[in-house]
Structures are given as C-alpha cells and as structure tokens.
Amino acid sequence: MNSPIQIWTCAAFHPAYGCGGWASVRSAQGQLTGAAGGQRNTTARRMALAGLAAALRDLPPGGKPIASGPIDIRTTSPELALFADVLNSLGQPTQSAPPGEDLDLWAPILTASAGRRLTLVRIPLEPGTPMAFTAAWAELARDKAKAGGAFTAAIPKGNLAKVPGLRLQVRAAD
C-alpha cells in the first residue's frame, strides 16, 4: 500500500462581516502543495468544505499510484468535524450520503474519495505545527477576502519549505 496522503486544512470565519477564508496543505509522496482562498457573504461551514475540496481537487483517480493510499485529514474546524462520519465512510462499501446543501463543494470531495479511505481527525491548534501554519494562512485569507472579495491562491513553495514538521522534496532537474 502506498503511503498516506496527508492534508491539513483550516477555516477562519468572521460572523460580523460574513466573510471567511480557508487554507489547506497536502503532502503526497513527499510533494507539498498548498492553497488558500476566501470569499464574502459565506458561512463557516462553506469555508471548511472549500478548504477540503481544494486540497482534494487535483488528485488523480484512486487507482493511480500517487493516489491509491489512504487520505489522512487533520483539521481544527468544528464545522468540518461535524461531517467526520460522512467523510470517514467515503470510499467504503457502506458509504453515508453527504448533506443536501453545498453540493458544489461536496462534488469534488466525492470525486476525489472514490476508491480511497478517508480519515478525518479534529486536532488542537498548537504553535510550530503544520496546523498552526495552515490556520495562519486561513486567517490571512479571511482578511484578504474581507478587503477584496473572493480569491484563491497557491501557497508559495518557499513558505511551505519553512513549515516545522513538513519536508519539501525538491524535484531533480530534468
């Protein structure tokens, strides 16, 4: 079995302004990727789902070598943790149906989960961890969305390389 794909995802939401941000970092076979985004007139739940959907969006189908391993998802989001039973059942013979709301965000999650085992765990936010890095980017994304509206951007590889607990594998020159 291939090594697991690890995902750290966080969401930040400001209820007074109705704006939110999300960030996710993914480690798959030593390759790190990260993205952040945000929008106005949203909910905390949509931001949590958007972060997970973004982390899963460009994975190859479950039968491909990089993607055949399980997906371990770590989050601090209570909104995403509410869906733990649904997410943990994806890819299993007795799969739970996703909620009927936010289907635009559930679609990429369901597509990416085909043929894979997902495990979602809510963890505490501790300084100097990949989760703290992801939470900081989610807060930055929330503030940027409040000021400028909807956006999505990649987290620079240079920033990912500095995260304690993550190792960035540099591709050899072709």
Residue locations for each model-derived region?
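RNase H-like nuclease fold core
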Residues: M1-R46, R57-D58, K64, R167-D174
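RNase H catalytic domain
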Residues: F13-A16, L52-A136
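Short, low-complexity, polar/charged sequence segments that are solvent-exposed and flexible
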Residues: V25-A28, T43, G91-T94, E139-D143
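Short, surface-exposed, polar/charged, turn-prone segments marking secondary-structure boundaries
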Residues: T33-A36, A53, P99-L103, A147-F151
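Low-complexity, flexible helical/coil segments
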Residues: N41-R46, P60-G63, A107-T111, I155-A161
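Loop-to-helix element that buttresses phosphate recognition and phosphoryl-transfer chemistry
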Residues: M47, G51
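Short, electropositive alpha-helical surface patch
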Residues: P130-G148
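Acidic two-metal-ion nuclease catalytic site recognized across multiple nuclease folds
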Residues: K144-D174
